[in-house]
């Protein structure tokens, strides 16, 4: 992850106008533009999860779609996030003011699930994004820590590859951890047949 020098904090609107068409991924974190530089294994997992969820969407005939890229505009000023996987409710996209012109959502109901594959900058995934997705009312947030990078308070002891599924209940996330040998349980995809083992194996050689 590379942080671009800025003279003053950037607004989300300025970030959206600035965003270059260079094939790279950028996020805005507290007014600072950050280039995301995911590893190959990181991208493998994101692609695998997107494919698995797309299959489940078709199989269960759900009104969802997964865009190739999508920016999430949280309530906090000066921030904009690009999760590894964003599941959108197609029926609610009409309420998104930016959607006709840009792949941007700002209402939590539009995205029932977002997934972040944890990187070396796990504090953003477990900190800023956790708080902001919760405040937006995004029903489910997955943290896929396939390299066990997060703090013990997030992934438990002993540290091991962990998928934390955060489900919104009474406006607060309730967290459940899944490790090797366990099947994932999702409220958004109740019939999903997916294990933590399969997700971690998708990374390939790390």
Name each region found by the language model.
Residues 1-206:
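Gly/Pro/Ser/Thr-rich low-complexity, intrinsically disordered segments predominantly at protein N-termini
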